[in-house]
C-alpha cells in the first residue's frame, strides 16, 4: 500500500491516500519548512520543490532565505492532489532606494519618462538618460493639480482653478487651452485630438488650433473612447457616436440608470464598465448584453489593471476581478469578484508589479502584497512611511516613489 501512495493516518486510525505540495519560488536557494520542519531547498538551477506522501490535512508552509521576508501560509493537502504555491517571490528585508531628486512636491509618469515638480515650482523631465528642466518657476502655471499624458504630443496640465494648458516638452513652453474651463471633464485622446465633455455635450478640438467641434446632437451622461470610437451613456442607452451628421448606433441598455446619479463609462482591458456615483460598479456581460452589479462601495472606487486582472479598491477594501479563468487554486471563475483584503487603515494607492503581486500604500506606508488569498495574505513592508505617490515601470521593473518630498527609485524588485 505504501508503494501505491497510501499511509496510515493515526488520527483517523486508517490508511488514506496521500497528497503533496509543489512550490516554486524566487530567488534561488530558498528553504522550505513544513510545520516548522526543514524539508529541502531550491538551487540556482532548480527553483521548484515537490513534496509527496503527505497525509491529507492542513500544513503550515514556510519559505525563507536570509535577508528576505519569509512567505508563510496554512494550506490544505488533499488526497491524490498536489497543492500548488508556484508564484512565490521573497522580497528583501532592506531594499536600496536611489535618490533621483530632493524637495519634490509631485511627479507624473508615462512609460519611460516622468515629469516632476519641485518645491520651487520648477518642472523637470526625468528619463533614463538624465534630468532636463522643462519650465522655470515663472513659466509653470500656478496651482498644478494634475499632468496627463494623453499621447506623446498631447500633455495636459490642469490647475486647481480650472485652467488647462498644453505642455510642449520639446519647445519647453505651455499654451492655454481657452476652450477648457472648470466645467470641462472627461478629456480623452483620439488621433491626437482631444475629445471632452462640457455641459453634457461632447466636443473635439485640435489643441494646437483650440477650435471646438460639437460631436453629440443630444446630451450625454458620460462617454469614453475605445479604438477611436466614442461610446456614450445617455440615460438608459449605450450608444456609439460618430459626429453631428451621422446617425448614432444603439449598442446596449442600462436598466439601472437613475436621473439623480452621476456616471462614468470606462473600458478596462477591453471590458466595458459603468461606475455609478464613484461607488457602484456595473459590468457588461457580453453573453446576454446586460450590465451586472459587481461592487457596491461606501467610498470612492478606484481601479488598476494588469492584462486579464483588475484590482478595484476603495479606502479600506481591495477586490480582484479576473477576466478569464486561470488554472490557479485561489482564483474563481472569470468575471467573479474576489475579496482580497479589508483593512482598518486607509488604502491610498495601488500599482501592479506583475500578475501575482502589487505594491500599495497603507496610511502612506509602502507595502507589497500577493493576491493569493488562501489563508492570510503575505504583505511585506518596504520601510517607507511617508509615501504619497508610486509608479512601477513594467518595462524596466523599477519602482519610483515620492517619500517625504524625496523622489526615489528602488533596485529591481521582481524577476
Task: State what each model feature region is.
Residues 120-139, 159-180, 197-217, 235-258, ...:
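Surface-exposed loop/turn elements that mediate protein-protein interactions on large endomembrane-trafficking
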Residues 386-415:
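Blade-level signature of beta-propeller repeat domains, shared across WD40, Kelch, NHL, RCC1
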Residues 93-103, 134-154, 160-162, 170-183:
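Blade-loop segments of beta-propeller domains
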Residues 350-397:
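Ankyrin-repeat and related helical/solenoid repeat scaffolds used for protein-protein interactions
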Residues 1-128, 156:
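Short loop/turn and low-complexity linker motifs enriched in small/turn-promoting residues
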Residues 114-115, 155, 194, 230-231, ...:
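Hydrophobic beta-strand positions that form the internal "hydrophobic ladder"
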Residues 101-107, 141-149, 181-192, 216-228, ...:
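Repeated scaffold domains used in trafficking and secretory/extracellular systems
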Residues 60-64, 231-234, 400:
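Short, aromatic- and glycine-rich surface loops/edge beta-strands on solvent-exposed regions
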Amino acid at each position: 500500500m505504501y508503494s501505491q501512495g497510501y499511509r496510515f493516518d493515526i488520527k483517523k486510525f486508517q490508511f488514506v491516500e496521500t497528497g503533496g505540495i509543489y512550490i516554486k519560488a524566487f530567488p534561488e536557494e530558498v528553504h522550505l519548512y513544513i510545520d516548522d520542519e526543514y524539508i529541502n531547498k531550491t538551487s540556482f538551477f532548480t527553483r521548484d520543490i515537490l513534496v509527496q506522501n503527505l497525509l491529507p490535512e492542513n500544513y503550515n508552509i514556510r519559505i525563507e532565505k536570509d535577508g528576505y521576508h519569509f512567505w508563510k501560509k496554512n494550506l490544505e493537502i488533499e488526497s491524490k492532489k498536489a497543492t500548488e504555491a508556484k508564484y512565490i517571490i521573497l522580497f528583501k528585508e532592506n531594499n536600496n532606494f536611489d535618490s533621483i531628486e530632493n524637495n519634490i512636491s509631485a511627479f507624473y509618469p508615462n512609460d519611460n519618462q516622468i515629469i516632476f515638480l519641485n518645491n520651487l515650482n520648477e518642472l523637470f523631465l526625468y528619463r533614463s538618460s538624465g534630468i532636463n528642466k522643462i519650465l522655470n518657476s515663472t513659466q509653470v502655471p500656478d496651482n498644478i493639480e494634475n499632468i496627463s499624458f494623453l499621447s506623446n504630443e498631447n500633455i495636459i496640465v490642469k490647475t486647481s482653478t480650472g485652467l488647462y494648458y498644453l505642455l510642449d516638452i520639446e519647445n519647453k513652453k505651455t499654451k492655454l487651452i481657452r476652450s477648457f474651463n472648470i466645467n470641462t471633464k472627461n478629456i480623452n485622446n483620439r488621433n491626437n485630438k482631444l475629445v471632452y465633455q462640457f455641459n453634457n455635450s461632447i466636443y473635439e478640438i485640435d489643441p494646437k488650433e483650440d477650435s471646438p467641434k460639437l460631436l453629440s446632437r443630444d446630451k450625454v451622461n458620460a462617454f469614453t473612447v475605445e479604438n477611436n470610437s466614442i461610446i456614450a451613456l445617455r440615460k438608459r442607452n449605450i450608444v456609439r457616436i460618430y459626429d453631428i451628421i451621422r446617425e448614432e448606433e444603439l449598442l446596449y441598455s442600462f436598466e439601472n440608470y437613475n436621473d439623480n446619479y452621476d456616471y462614468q463609462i470606462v473600458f478596462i482591458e477591453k471590458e466595458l464598465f459603468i461606475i455609478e456615483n464613484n461607488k457602484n460598479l456595473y459590468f457588461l456581460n457580453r453573453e446576454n448584453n446586460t450590465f451586472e452589479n459587481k461592487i457596491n462601495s461606501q467610498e470612492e472606487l478606484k481601479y488598476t489593471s494588469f492584462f486579464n486582472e483588475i484590482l478595484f479598491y476603495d479606502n479600506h477594501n481591495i477586490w480582484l476581478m479576473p477576466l478569464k479563468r486561470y488554472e490557479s487554486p485561489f482564483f474563481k471563475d472569470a468575471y467573479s469578484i474576489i475579496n482580497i483584503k479589508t483593512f482598518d487603515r486607509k488604502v491610498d494607492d495601488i500599482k501592479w508589479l506583475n500578475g501575482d503581486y502589487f505594491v500599495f500604500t497603507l496610511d502612506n506606508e509602502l507595502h507589497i502584497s500577493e493576491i493569493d488569498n488562501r489563508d492570510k495574505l503575505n504583505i511585506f513592508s518596504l520601510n517607507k512611511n511617508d509615501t504619497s505617490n508610486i509608479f512601477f515601470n513594467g518595462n524596466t521593473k523599477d519602482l519610483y516613489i515620492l517619500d517625504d518630498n524625496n523622489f526615489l527609485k528602488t533596485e529591481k524588485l521582481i524577476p
